[in-house]
From Swiss-Prot:
It is an enzyme of class 2 (transferase). This is Uncharacterized methyltransferase RBAM_024380. Its EC number is 2.1.1.-. Belongs to the methyltransferase superfamily. YrrT family. Could be a S-adenosyl-L-methionine-dependent methyltransferase. Gene3D superfamilies: Vaccinia Virus protein VP39. The gene is yrrT. Signal peptide: none annotated. It comes from the Bacteria. SUPFAM superfamilies: S-adenosyl-L-methionine-dependent methyltransferases (SSF53335). It comes from Bacillus velezensis (strain DSM 23117 / BGSC 10A6 / LMG 26770 / FZB42).
Amino acid sequence: MGREFIPLFEDWAATYDATVHGADKQYAAVFKGYDNILDSIVALSGSNVLEFGPGTGNLTAKLAAANKKVFGVEPSPSMRKLAADKLSDKAVFSDGDFLEFPAPPFQIDTIVSSYAFHHLTDEEKRTAVKQYGAILQKHDKIVFADTVFKDHEAYDEAIKKAIRNGYHQLADDLKTEHYPTLGTMKNIFSEEGFAARFTQQNDFVWIMEAIKR
């Protein structure tokens, strides 16, 4: 369920914000256009938002600044504390993950996440989307930004390129986490009752907007 990655995020919490803004060159391409990507999620979101994996609260802050109500579900205690400190009383945060989480304290119309859905296996991704379909009403939506590959060949090439560049930590991440292909995500959303569109943001990240039919 992605909780095996909690130790990683406990260690990363203190330097995460620096990483997303380019401090670690290995991940510079992954986080290229980071603020614009988050702004796009905000623009596509409704008024009442359930956010999975808010991390240090960067997307949450943008959602709150746009006067959206946000319930954040974050499994990492260190990340959750940083987010709560950053947002003060502008959002509510709770322990949980993509598959096991408390009921939001209000009726949601949008589920969002940034740079986190790949912590689930493809089977778990399907289970999660099925769950969300049971929560959302018709025309409500899921808006996720995450690394997705056009096909398996593109995934393999990304690993080779990382190794060629000496980015061995990035290569290891690509090998060990559960990055999906576009085809996989299209099938999951379609088969679980969503009409989805995908917009590429950089060499790694796509925004997935899935509207419940």
